[in-house]
């Protein structure tokens, strides 16, 4: 399992939100490229970038920062989400050196777009499912749909989606532990690998995910915990690697 540091971009700065609320943002750095360097030095093997402005505006807003990080670390897999609603945007990011694009809102509203994107950019597409009480939320979490996360995940199995980033909105940014039960249920219900997100507070939360012995969970995204120092990236990755060795 990979420990994946999150860099959330708002107005060019690295921030964290609580429960996806744009007016409840903590600025952690005015230099996201330097922040990426910090996590690379800590030994991360993948980065999770989110264009928060883009998620709300429906098109990339912090694209220059994303490109700068991708250029600085050409060998580091980077996944980007937020405002990805067209094939042109995906092409722009892929050309910039980004490894994966995360389709969120558009995946819920127009599932056929995921099929198109997977066909045009095989192996590059991740679907972001943000859920509240099992139902998928869209538009920067402003709207909760009537679509069940598990049903939508199954819908994408035939498309060749690389992974699903599953975020429990109620947990995100609150550091109260990840929704292990819902994450495991999704991983077991679908053949698509799952990346857990939202609520990870400390090494104990990583251990809980590992203890489920769910092969379908391939990573855990962490944000506020690594910025506030309750989780150490290197230590958490070492724990995951140890589990893999034991198997």
From Swiss-Prot:
Which Pfam families does the record match to this protein? His_biosynth (PF00977)
Keyword tags: Amino-acid biosynthesis, Cytoplasm, Histidine biosynthesis, Isomerase
Q: What are the recorded Gene Ontology BP terms?
A: L-histidine biosynthetic process; L-tryptophan biosynthetic process
Where is the catalytic site?
8, 130
What is the uppermost EC class here? isomerase
Please classify the protein's predominant subcellular localization into one broad category: cytoplasm
Instruction: Work out whether the entry's keyword set contains Lyase.
Output: no
Where on the tree of life does the source sit, at the highest rank?
A: Bacteria
Please state where this protein is localized.
Cytoplasm
Q: What is its EC number?
A: 5.3.1.16
The biological pathway it contributes to is: Amino-acid biosynthesis; L-histidine biosynthesis; L-histidine from 5-phospho-alpha-D-ribose 1-diphosphate: step 4/9
SUPFAM superfamilies documented for this protein: Ribulose-phoshate binding barrel
Which InterPro entries does the protein's record reference?
Answer: Aldolase_TIM (IPR013785), His_biosynth (IPR006062), HisA_bact_arch (IPR006063), Isoase_HisA-like (IPR044524), Isoase_HisA-like_bact (IPR023016), RibuloseP-bd_barrel (IPR011060)
- Per UniProt, what is one GO molecular function of this protein? 1-(5-phosphoribosyl)-5-[(5-phosphoribosylamino)methylideneamino]imidazole-4-carboxamide isomerase activity
Show the GO cellular component annotation of the record.
cytoplasm
Q: Which reaction does it catalyse?
A: 1-(5-phospho-beta-D-ribosyl)-5-[(5-phospho-beta-D-ribosylamino)methylideneamino]imidazole-4-carboxamide = 5-[(5-phospho-1-deoxy-D-ribulos-1-ylimino)methylamino]-1-(5-phospho-beta-D-ribosyl)imidazole-4-carboxamide
Q: Which NCBIfam families match?
A: 1-(5-phosphoribosyl)-5-[(5-phosphoribosylamino)methylideneamino]imidazole-4-carboxamide isomerase
Membership in a protein family: Belongs to the HisA/HisF family.
Annotated protein name in UniProt = 1-(5-phosphoribosyl)-5-[(5-phosphoribosylamino)methylideneamino] imidazole-4-carboxamide isomerase
Species source reads Stutzerimonas stutzeri (strain A1501) (Pseudomonas stutzeri)
What is the name of the gene encoding this protein?
A: hisA
């Amino acid at each position: 399992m990979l420990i994946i540091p999150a860099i959330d971009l708002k107005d060019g700065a690295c921030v964290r939100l609580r429960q996806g609320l744009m007016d409840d943002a903590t600025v952690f750095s005015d230099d996201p490229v330097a922040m990426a360097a910090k996590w690379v030095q800590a030994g991360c093997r993948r980065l999770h970038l989110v264009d928060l402005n883009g998620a709300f505006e429906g098109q990339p807003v912090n694209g220059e920062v994303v490109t700068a990080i991708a250029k600085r670390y050409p060998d580091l897999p980077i996944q980007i989400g937020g405002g990805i609603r067209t094939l042109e945007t995906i092409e722009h990011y892929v050309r910039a050196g980004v490894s994966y694009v995360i389709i969120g809102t558009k995946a819920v509203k127009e599932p056929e777009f995921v099929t198109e994107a997977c066909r045009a950019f095989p192996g590059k597409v991740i679907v972001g499912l943000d859920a509240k009480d099992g139902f998928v939320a869209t538009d920067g979490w402003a709207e909760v749909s009537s679509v069940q996360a598990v049903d939508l995940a199954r819908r994408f199995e035939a498309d060749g989606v690389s992974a699903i980033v599953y975020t429990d909105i109620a947990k995100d940014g609150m550091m109260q532990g990840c929704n292990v039960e819902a994450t495991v249920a999704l991983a077991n219900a679908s053949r698509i690998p799952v990346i857990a997100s939202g609520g990870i507070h400390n090494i104990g939360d990583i251990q809980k995910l590992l203890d489920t012995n769910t092969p379908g969970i391939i990573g855990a995204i962490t944000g506020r915990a690594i910025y506030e120092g309750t989780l150490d990236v290197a230590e958490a990755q070492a724990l995951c690697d140890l589990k893999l060795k034991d198997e």
